[in-house]
Amino acid sequence: MNKALRQKKIRELVENNDVSGQQELLGMLEKEGFSVAQPTLSRDFAEMGIVRNRTADGGYRLSVPEEPQEDILRGLVGMEVLSITANETSIIINTLPGRAHGVGSFLDRINSPEILGTIAGDDTVLVIPATIRKISSVKSYIQKILSQP
């Protein structure tokens, strides 16, 4: 099962229904054809920022925070990037100290088919392209989305 597709369905169900908790949502996901374990759902909640709020009638309702404005988020992440370099097989992004994880997470959440994955240290992100034949275009794509020269 695709994580992005599952999280999209979770967002849709929580936004369009009065869902009181994880067990209720697990049942709704099952009816939609998604078999999800409770620990996986808990991790999705943490990643997506889903919280359980008390309603006026004393019950509970899950809520999803608004999506951050993409341009603002890109600008903030872009300010953390010091340089982007590449060789024949990979792309390296140097960041401010302690900010590599945030930059790597941002790139992972874009779900670009051009990026196989990222590995982040303290101030360096290793970007693994889906194919080494497109290193130059992937580097340009990353520079564009992070507003880097």
Swiss-Prot record:
This is Arginine repressor. Pathway: Amino-acid biosynthesis; L-arginine biosynthesis [regulation]. GO terms for biological process: L-arginine biosynthetic process; protein complex oligomerization; regulation of arginine biosynthetic process. Belongs to the ArgR family. GO terms for molecular function: arginine binding; DNA binding; DNA-binding transcription factor activity. The keyword Transcription regulation applies. Disulfide bonds: none annotated. InterPro entries: Arg_repress, Arg_repress_C, Arg_repress_C_sf, Arg_repress_DNA-bd, WH-like_DNA-bd_sf, WH_DNA-bd_sf. The lineage of its organism: Bacteria, Pseudomonadati, Chlorobiota, Chlorobiia, Chlorobiales. Keywords: Amino-acid biosynthesis, Arginine biosynthesis, Cytoplasm, DNA-binding, Repressor, Transcription, Transcription regulation. Pfam families: Arg_repressor (PF01316), Arg_repressor_C (PF02863). It is found in: Cytoplasm. It comes from Chlorobaculum parvum (strain DSM 263 / NCIMB 8327). Regulates arginine biosynthesis genes. One of its GO terms (cellular component) is cytoplasm.
